Amino acid sequence: PAAPGVPQTFADNAIVLDYGTQEALDVIRNRADEIAAVLIEPVQSANPFLQPKEFLQEIRRITKECKIAMIMDEVITGFRAAPGGAQEWF
């Protein structure tokens, strides 16, 4: 686990993918039957200038088509990006 308090089983059952890559999209498509949810920071705290709108829109298309929950971690962005959060903006 990357942080204290994160159970080892969470880390064992998570797939960590590179942000903004075609490979990440392919993995989600190809392993959709194994994936319950995609958790993503729409604007990464470590790299706030990387905002690949098309990537996020494609993840939404894939998750909707495959009936996978898409969860946007907006602890950093919250309502700062738009009244509906970054998910409204993307």
Regions picked out by a protein language model, each given a short descriptive name:
Residues 87-90:
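Conserved active-site segment immediately N-terminal to the catalytic lysine
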Residues 17, 40, 72-73:
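Active-site flanking residues adjacent to catalytic metal/cofactor-binding acidic residues
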Residues 1-37:
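PLP-dependent aspartate aminotransferase-fold enzymes
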Residues 49-83:
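Catalytic PLP-binding core of fold-type I/II PLP enzymes
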Residues 22, 46, 83:
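Surface-exposed, flexible loop/turn segments at secondary-structure boundaries
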Residues 32-49:
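Short acidic, glycine-rich surface-loop motifs adjacent to enzyme active sites
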Residues 21, 44, 76-77:
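Short, glycine/acidic-enriched loop or turn micro-motifs at the edges of active sites
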Residues 20, 29, 37-40, 56-66:
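Metal-dependent enolase-superfamily TIM-barrel catalytic cores that perform enediolate-based chemistry
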